[in-house]
């Protein structure tokens, strides 16, 4: 039982809700996933980190997690640490940087791609949220970065 209105109670209800929605999706040939941002790294009632609690209290049969690597880093955590802590739970990877992919140096794409198998990555989505140049040039820089990065090729040749 939880105290009605407490953050812990609300958190428990969300996990139960996600499990139920995920189960219904599975029964209808779909998948249900959750995409993080930086606020999931706040502690709830000074206890667990919200993202950890969600991963630990949702059923992997019903709920997958799409890791947004940029927001993990902005939340002051390591994507690879999460891969190792929760292997197989991140079947979708959302790669993003401050601007064009690989330009800020803050995300650590080499370690992310080298450990994608541990994460359970099946699909990757790339996003450019902000641009340092015209949009099409920004997209080209990001695509070129992915095509030329040796760790991207290495992680998919295994």
In which residue ranges do the predicted regions lie?
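Generic structural microfeature
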Residues: 3-4, 27, 88, 141
């Amino acid at each position: 039982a939880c105290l009605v209105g407490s953050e812990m109670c609300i958190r428990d209800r969300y996990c139960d809700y996600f499990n139920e929605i995920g189960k219904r999706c599975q029964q209808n040939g779909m998948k249900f996933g959750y995409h993080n941002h930086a606020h999931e790294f706040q502690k709830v009632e000074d206890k667990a980190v919200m993202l950890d609690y969600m991963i630990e209290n949702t059923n992997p049969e019903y709920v997958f997690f799409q890791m947004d690597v940029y927001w993990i880093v902005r939340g002051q955590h390591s994507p690879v640490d999460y891969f190792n802590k929760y292997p197989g739970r991140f079947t979708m990877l959302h790669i993003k940087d401050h601007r064009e992919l690989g330009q800020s140096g803050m995300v650590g794409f080499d370690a992310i791609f080298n450990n994608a198998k541990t994460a359970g990555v099946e699909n990757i989505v790339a996003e450019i949220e902000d641009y340092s140049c015209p949009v099409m040039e920004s997209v080209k820089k990001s695509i070129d970065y992915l095509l030329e990065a040796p760790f991207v090729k290495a992680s998919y040749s295994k």
